[in-house]
């Protein structure tokens, strides 16, 4: 009787664990595309309360800083080629 109860308990644990492994909590539209919006989240973001409404000036700050960084790096490389040693702070 003890063996039967043990086997029954193991079988039930195995059955429950297989069901738990099979369900991942997502409804995928296709493999790799499993994002689901939360209830109440709009299909279209523009014009909703979730729209970030970025300022174009703020968006261009990163582009300007990257251009300035590239210009500084070009000066450093030109100085390194002409002098033979690398100097970080080149005016």
From Swiss-Prot:
Gene Ontology annotations of biological process type: methanol oxidation
Signal peptide feature range: 1-22
SUPFAM superfamilies: Methanol dehydrogenase subunit
Membrane topology: Peripheral membrane protein
GO cellular component terms given for this protein: plasma membrane
Domain of life where this protein originates: Bacteria
InterPro entries found in the cross-reference section: Meth_DH_bsu (IPR003420), Meth_DH_bsu_sf (IPR036557)
EC number: 1.1.2.7
Reaction(s) catalysed (UniProt annotation): 2 Fe(III)-[cytochrome cL] + a primary alcohol = 2 Fe(II)-[cytochrome cL] + an aldehyde + 2 H(+)
Keywords: Cell inner membrane, Cell membrane, Disulfide bond, Membrane, Methanol utilization, Oxidoreductase, Signal
Subunit structure, interactors included: Heterotetramer composed of 2 alpha and 2 beta subunits.
Similarity remark: Belongs to the methanol dehydrogenase subunit 2 family.
Protein name: Methanol dehydrogenase [cytochrome c] subunit 2
Species, as recorded: Methylophilus methylotrophus (Bacterium W3A1)
Gene expressing this chain: moxI
